Amino acid sequence: MALVHKLLRGTYFLRKFSKPTSALYPFLGIRFAEYSSSLQKPVASPGKASSQRKTEGDLQGDHQKEVALDITSSEEKPDVSFDKAIRDEAIYHFRLLKDEIVDHWRGPEGHPLHEVLLEQAKVVWQFRGKEDLDKWTVTSDKTIGGRSEVFLKMGKNNQSALLYGTLSSEAPQDGESTRSGYCAMISRIPRGAFERKMSYDWSQFNTLYLRVRGDGRPWMVNIKEDTDFFQRTNQMYSYFMFTRGGPYWQEVKIPFSKFFFSNRGRIRDVQHELPLDKISSIGFTLADKVDGPFFLEIDFIGVFTDPAHTEEFAYENSPELNPRLFK
């Protein structure tokens, strides 16, 4: 209720300051910030601008402390209602909060009811429009001076996502970097009501399920856990995905028990199981050192429970089997 009280009292700040600043973002939210930034100041016509300069010249020498000149007509003034914008922002976030409460109704054995009805299978990401692409971001070694390029767009008939580009392993000429050549596609961290950071709970599933079509290149599938510790931001769990090439789709099933633990791109000696109850994001990385064009088409990404897979962890990691790691 305190947050709602601050949100509804946002008009006090708007009346006190001439235009909203970044200090108001915690009260108004990102959507309202984008809305307010889209409002452009009206520009006077050349004729009116000259008349303004003439008026200002006539006012020189007067002993008026404050002079307010209205150079815009009533037709040019934008119809801005900050109260309405605040109400719309509050309604939007309360609608998200309602959806979160409904989605967390528990079913048999404590599992969400809609997942039980779907036989414990769930499509997490699918690509049927531009709003689905907005949930992802792409990056390459261009951020460190490399020459690789990567792009993401909708596939044919808007039924898939097409990740394509050119891979270049040429190291940047900066005198420091010795290796280069990677492209990646990473999902954005989900946000809930009032811009709260959310995570995915896949603890009732045991397999990652993808439907993809590639050009024969190997990809690295990376999963990151949700954490608030800065020291763990570079930690992830990875496994390989091999595409066949050709015009046919392939269904890829990767058990979560196969994902190995790494930090800053290096596989660690001490392995840990993937914490499925707090998944932050998933990504796909290409770094096979084969220069040239590439593509990867993705239909959907989901999770499901494979009853035939009973393995809990693929890597032996106990003090009895490897005491050197647990000294």
Swiss-Prot record:
Residues with the Phosphoserine modification: 318
InterPro entries for the chain: Galactose-bd-like_sf, NADH-UbQ_OxRdtase-assoc_prot30, NDUFAF1
Main location: mitochondrion
Entry keyword set: Chaperone, Disease variant, Mitochondrion, Phosphoprotein, Primary mitochondrial disease, Transit peptide
Keyword Mitochondrion: yes
Expression tissues: Ubiquitous.
GO biological process entries: chaperone-mediated protein complex assembly; mitochondrial electron transport, NADH to ubiquinone; mitochondrial respiratory chain complex I assembly; protein-containing complex assembly
Region entry Disordered, spans: 42-63
Cellular compartments per GO CC: cytosol; mitochondrial inner membrane; mitochondrial matrix; mitochondrion
Span of the signal peptide: none
Gene3D superfamilies noted in UniProt: Galactose-binding lectin
Basic and acidic residues biased stretches: 53-63
Location(s), subcellular: Mitochondrion; Mitochondrion matrix
Gene Ontology MF annotations: unfolded protein binding
Transit peptide: 1-24
Subunit relationships: Part of the mitochondrial complex I assembly/MCIA complex that comprises at least the core subunits TMEM126B, NDUFAF1, ECSIT and ACAD9 and complement subunits such as COA1 and TMEM186. Interacts with ECSIT. Interacts with ACAD9. At early stages of complex I assembly, it is found in intermediate subcomplexes that contain different subunits including NDUFB6, NDUFA6, NDUFA9, NDUFS3, NDUFS7, ND1, ND2 and ND3. Interacts with TMEM70 and TMEM242.
Disease: Mitochondrial complex I deficiency, nuclear type 11: A form of mitochondrial complex I deficiency, the most common biochemical signature of mitochondrial disorders, a group of highly heterogeneous conditions characterized by defective oxidative phosphorylation, which collectively affects 1 in 5-10000 live births. Clinical disorders have variable severity, ranging from lethal neonatal disease to adult-onset neurodegenerative disorders.
Similarity-based family: Belongs to the CIA30 family.
Function statement: As part of the MCIA complex, involved in the assembly of the mitochondrial complex I.
Name the UniProt record assigns to this protein: Complex I intermediate-associated protein 30, mitochondrial
